[in-house]
Amino acid sequence: FNLYGKFFKMQNYLVLLLAIFALNSYAEIIGKANVTDGDTIVINDIRIRFTGSDAPESYFFGKTQTCLDENGKEWECGKAATKKLKQLISNQTVRCSDEGQDRYGRTLGICYVGDMDLQAEMVKSGMAVAYLRYSDRYEQQQNYAKKVKAGMWSGTFLEPEVWRKENRN
């Protein structure tokens, strides 16, 4: 009867269990994505809201967010943002980190196609704004979009968060 041997085996099991928990704590969601709007996708029935960016709404209580271009002409920036994200994904496999959940129960994530950060591309193209209240992760991309007057920055628009508050039923 060897107590030291039993203790050593138990210690190995504990190390193995800790390793498994550590791997599960950094979960990734990988698969084909269905685009809901410019900052939300669904992979394997998991609704993922991009963290760090906010896109105009394509459908919010029956309404689509509009913006004004450089000539003051109204355009459906919400639908344009959804279209842009669909183009970026282009039926490729998407990989998202699981960053927890928002207050609506959606999984928050940073999502990639290959090495391309989808949120960074959406902000850089002016089809989303950096969610600076939560993170400065995409501030450089937003500054670039403003400088070149990309997407929404070509004219005037309400920040998506403000637009949602004004258009809630």
Where are these regions (language model features)?
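Small beta-barrel nucleic-acid-binding modules, primarily SNase/OB-fold domains
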Residues: 11-14, 21-169
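Short, Lys/Arg-enriched N-terminal segments with co-localized hydrophobic residues
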Residues: 1-9
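Short non-domain terminal segments
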Residues: 5-6, 19-21
